């Protein structure tokens, strides 16, 4: 589906899962002229989330975009990793909204498939999960970077995504990004 068709397919009012990263900044800008947006930011209760919140807060304030913030509420079960717990909490927060769009892209799909296959359970990111929609799954991350660079938009990088000691980050940097660049 081309981007013009996508604009007309989405509802007029929608919520963007907004982290302040390049993908979510690009889709906020892309959708902003044709849709009534609300930004949904999830605070994980960490210093990294504090810095991300500052960026997201000022971005939304400067553009007049309503911002809704969710916070960690539940204790992490012993059988859950932190990453899994945070993801579950984020999706629980996003259930509060009628129609949510995320910035998941092709790189995310490939990374998730490789990582999950290495753990014996290969999965593909679905384009829809309840009220959460991922219309950009066929677009490589570079599309979002190019969009932001062409529009002189700034975004924030999450430093926790670059530490190679985590297998998912290693896959992202050394397999996916090298193959798609």
Could you describe each region identified by the protein language model?
Residues 1-146, 150-173:
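Core alpha/beta nucleotide-donor-binding catalytic domains of modification enzymes
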Residues 177-181:
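An accessory alpha-helical subdomain
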């Amino acid at each position: 589906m081309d981007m013009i068709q996508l604009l007309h397919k989405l509802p007029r009012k929608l919520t963007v899962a907004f982290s302040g990263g390049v993908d979510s900044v690009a889709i906020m800008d892309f959708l902003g002229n044709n849709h009534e947006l609300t930004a949904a930011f999830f605070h994980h209760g960490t210093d990294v989330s504090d810095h991300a919140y500052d960026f997201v807060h000022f971005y939304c304030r400067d553009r007049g975009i309503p911002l809704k913030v969710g916070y960690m509420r539940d204790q992490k079960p012993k059988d859950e990793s932190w990453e899994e717990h945070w993801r579950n909490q984020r999706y629980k927060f996003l259930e509060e909204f009628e129609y949510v769009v995320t910035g998941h892209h092709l790189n995310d799909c490939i990374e998730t498939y490789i990582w999950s296959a290495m753990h014996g359970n290969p999965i593909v990111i679905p384009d829809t999960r309840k009220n959460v929609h991922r219309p950009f799954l066929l677009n490589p991350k570079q599309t979002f970077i190019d969009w932001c660079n062409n529009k002189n938009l700034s975004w924030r990088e999450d430093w926790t995504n670059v530490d190679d000691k985590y297998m998912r980050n290693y896959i992202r940097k050394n397999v996916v990004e090298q193959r798609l660049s």
